[in-house]
Amino acid sequence: MLSAMGCTPKTDAGDATTTPENPELILATTTSTQDSGLLDFLLPLFTEDTGYTVKTIAVGTGKALQMGRDGEADVLLVHAKSDEEKFVEEGDGTERHDVMYNDFILVGPKEDALNLKEQFGNDIAGGLKAISDNMATFVSRGDDSGTHKKELAIWKSADIEPAGDWYLSAGSGMADVLKIADEKQAYTITDRATYLSMQSDLGLEILIEGDENLFNQYGVIPVNPEKGETINNEGAVAFMDWILSEKGQNLIKEFGVEEYGQPLFIPNAN
């Protein structure tokens, strides 16, 4: 997809005074930051402040990290922390910082025929076991995204290997998976931000939330400029500094409040 807890943020990012020598920047990120509308909100303001224009490539976290390894992106905004730390340790990125977090939730048909909300409330492993035991339709991202990685980890923690006609692997982004789950009146795990941004168009409701295993941390990583001659390291660092700045963090905190009554992401830069 293409498109042109307490925080201690960096000092505020000022307005651009000169046009950067290389003003074009490639950001590889997750579909959740795109589908939620966050990037449409942030990036014009980043451009206004710095002079950099951003081409966004929204894919799963696994694909975004691979783009970095292949030198096909300048900076990453992703959400699979252990994989991100490994990416930096192996020399593919120069540094990694927490940016913001939200959480994953289990959504499903409002009728809730399995009574997951009442029975399991905040127990995601218990809810998934009930879905598996009853062979209720579940739609997986199936795309090596951060959300997909989290889902697989939770199945594993519940000692369940999901397989069968009831388990559908979509190989798609979060917005598409929510639409499929809605059409099939199925269950899925989603980040809260994308769900809230689409909630009015879906017949799905939140059934399980609040489990500590559903925490969803996002990080920013400039790609190592040695990964390719075209890597725009100055632009990558400018993006990192801006999104970690007091201004960037405050904008993240504001996003979604007016429309949804709550922020879709909580800033926690370090």
Task: Describe each region flagged by the PLM.
Residues 25, 52-54:
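Conserved beta-strand core positions
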Residues 106:
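Serine endopeptidase catalytic core focused on the charge-relay Asp
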Residues 71, 102-103:
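Short, conserved active-site loops that position catalytic residues or coordinate cofactors/metal ions
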Residues 2-6:
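C-terminal motif of bacterial Sec signal peptides marking the signal peptidase cleavage site
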Residues 7-47, 62, 66, 72, ...:
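Exported/periplasmic ABC-transporter solute-binding proteins
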Residues 75-101:
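Acidic, polar ligand-binding/catalytic clefts
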